[in-house]
Amino acid sequence: DFSQIICCALNKRGVEWSSLGDEVCTQTLSKERHLIISDTSKDCDVNSDKFETYLRLHKITKVVVLVANSETFDIKVKRNGAIKYFHMPVDLSELSHAKSFYLNLFLEQFLVKHVNLPCDDPETADLVALLCKLAGSNASVLINGPTGTGKEVVAKLLHAKSARKDEAFIAVNCAAIPENMLESMLFGHEKGAFTGALQSNVGLFRAAHSGTILLDEISEMPLTLQSKLLRVLQEKVVTPVGSTKEIAIDIRVLATTNRNMLQEIQANNFREDLFYRLNVFPVSTCALKSRPLDIPAIAAHLLTRNVSENGTPKILSTEALNKLVQHEWPGNVRELDNVIQRAEILSCANEIGHTDIVFDNDLTFRPRNTFEALNSKLDVKVG
């Protein structure tokens, strides 16, 4: 039934849930609680005083009612928008891209503030299950995968599921910070340690104390700094630039890379000892083309991302969904994000059609040709 399907989808995303009346689970859930009523519109009167009392008693902040598309459900009291209902226009018992899209579109109504990994592919669901187990450890994790496959989302999920979730999560792009500034940014510096150091700086490692730090694109870190990072990981101390004092830190270190690290070691671009210190538990993210079942779920997430609290996201037609699933996605999720944003702009209706799906290789970087490619979509004359 609806309930089993929803619970299965929540499990795939690594989202905790509890059944009504499960007081033990209710006490352990986050402060912002949601109630899902599925396929029970005839049995549950959300307008009753009894229901109102139940919401206050359990500190439930939002109610989402899932009903079949053929049903009508009149909610007389909106509770300032706290009660919403979502019509399911497809049969959830059928396996289809449309079913996956609408189910995940429904889940996005109340998962906006919850860190989770939109997915429907069995391998991705297995990855989420692994991450939930791994989150309980303080071990370093090296996340490897092609650009645009969600490595930072994986890192955020590890942090959100850990005991450190209420502490800082700091991401550092090792490729974006100049080499002469990276050591100071990471480990801090004392006042006067170098020209321009007008005041002391604690550094990102100390700023993330008790929390998690993500070293994004760790393979781009200069060799001279790798040895200092190795000592930080081994001894759990940092030494600010211009100081001889070691400062203890309690921190979990995650790292990402899109390179083959063994090849980087052989080319003397990365220290072997640092690799093994980071690679306590390796995790890999796959290219989007190898997990097409995730595409409807990710598309639903992208369409609801910028919608206001009481707004309605656009939907994808069956033809548009099929077009997305059949694409190769060389740019992975980043490319999918671009295509979805483009489709939202081009679509004049609430439903995005297959003609609104324009891939990057359909466009050029020449303004005239780009305008001509979009001209039929926008229905305007160009120059």
Predicted stretch roles:
Residues 105-126:
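Dynamic helix-loop-helix/coil hinge segments at AAA+ ATPase domain boundaries and subdomain interfaces
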Residues 17-20, 193-199, 235-240:
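Short gly/ser/thr-rich secondary-structure transition/capping motifs
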